[in-house]
Amino acid sequence: MMETKQIYDDFLQYFNVEEIVSPGIYEKYNHLGDYFFLSRFDIRILATMVFIRTTLNKAITINDWLWGGRFDERGLRDTSTPMVQDRAKKNDPWLSAHVVGMAFDFDVKEMTANEVREWLFKFRDCLPYKIRLERKLNGEFISWVHLDVCDDPRNPKIYSFDV
């Protein structure tokens, strides 16, 4: 089993911490360094993303707010993010894998979300951990990849679900 620090260092070769946290959290805690942020994530999601990035050898985009993009809730969702705030205002219980550092939404350069999901199924035996993939939202295939490492022992290596 790989050491935590090695997984963190491998992850940082391909991703900036700004890609996985909100602007508010980054601004408040960036003085504590990258390992502080990474320690808030399940090690399985970090290792799985490194596997995907190195095996596909294609750029992956999670949050892009750092570069002026529109995505800022595709990694850790915290109390500064609108999705969490909106649910709290409605007193709507919500147990998202994003809130507990177990999920990423992402895009892979030059691949559609369906192509990425198909690729993951093809290489499922090589994945370091079991994963869950969101497929459809309100009956339509989503245009991004949602991947999480919530591990229900009743699920297969890759479990697809719709919301």
Regions found by a protein language model. Give the residues of each.
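Intrinsic-disorder/low-complexity regions
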Residues: 8-9, 15, 29, 33, ...
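Short amphipathic alpha-helical segments, especially helix-boundary/capping motifs
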Residues: 21-27, 79-80, 90-94
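Extended, low-complexity, intrinsically disordered C-terminal regulatory tails
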Residues: 46-90
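Intrinsic-disorder/low-complexity loop/linker signature
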Residues: 24, 33, 75, 139-140, ...
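Short linear motifs at secondary-structure transitions and domain/linker junctions
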Residues: 36-39, 70-85, 115-124
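Active-site acidic/histidine clusters and adjacent loop/turn architecture
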Residues: 1-62
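Catalytic cores and adjacent binding grooves of peptidoglycan-active enzymes
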Residues: 93-104, 108-163
